[in-house]
């Protein structure tokens, strides 16, 4: 992360991960601009949650962008109400909640928006350590997208991924480090069924979130120490 970065664009869904990234960014940068994408998602309540959180956290600006074309192109349990969310993997080894091209599109549009604003970096809450199995959450993908944006727009632009090498318990610890654990727990929306806070308790997103929270609450000191170590001496931050 460059010391010269002062203005950033956060890809902001209103969920646990992106909200934690937003909270951290507000302590590190002069201008924090959020961008939220409306793609006709199953859990589209997250858009209103993102609007509310952006106002509550007093970020520099918040833009909601209509990308409904993605809904037409990408068939997934998150873009089709008729497809139930499954706990089983598909034949290709991916969850049926995977939306093909979603992060390719989101990071491309965030890059264009960053160019327009004169921002030096994009922040996204993707994670390879403790994630849902999506290929577009991996470190190598993010680096490839960063390279494509830099070459395609002839502009220096970093994609920062603060959570890339953290597990879910450490992500909860990060929110707690900034004294925002309760806000993230009770006012974000991660649930695929659109239920704020602890969610439905049944979908894969809720299971992952709750397991991480339980791990953190049962081992606060150890997890916080591991978070500090991961930040200071862990794998290089993407």
UniProtKB/Swiss-Prot annotation:
GO molecular function per UniProt: ATP binding; ligase activity, forming carbon-nitrogen bonds; zinc ion binding
Matching CDD domains: QueC-like (cd01995)
Top-level taxon: Bacteria
Pathway(s) per entry: Purine metabolism; 7-cyano-7-deazaguanine biosynthesis
Residues given in the record as Zn(2+) binding sites: 191, 200, 203, 206
Disulfide bonds: none
Protein residues bound to ATP: 12-22
Catalytic activity: 7-carboxy-7-deazaguanine + NH4(+) + ATP = 7-cyano-7-deazaguanine + ADP + phosphate + H2O + H(+)
Co-factor: note: Binds 1 zinc ion per subunit.
Keyword Aminoacyl-tRNA synthetase: no
Keywords, ordered alphabetically: ATP-binding, Ligase, Metal-binding, Nucleotide-binding, Queuosine biosynthesis, Zinc
Pfam families the UniProt entry points to: QueC
GO biological process terms, semicolon-separated: queuosine biosynthetic process
Entry keyword ATP-binding: yes
EC class name: ligase
Cofactor dependence: Zn(2+)
Entry EC no(s): 6.3.4.20
Free-text function comment from the UniProt entry: Catalyzes the ATP-dependent conversion of 7-carboxy-7-deazaguanine (CDG) to 7-cyano-7-deazaguanine (preQ(0)).
Family: Belongs to the QueC family.
Identification of the protein by name: 7-cyano-7-deazaguanine synthase
Originating species: Shewanella oneidensis (strain ATCC 700550 / JCM 31522 / CIP 106686 / LMG 19005 / NCIMB 14063 / MR-1)
Phylogenetic placement of the source organism: Bacteria, Pseudomonadati, Pseudomonadota, Gammaproteobacteria, Alteromonadales
Gene encoding the protein: queC
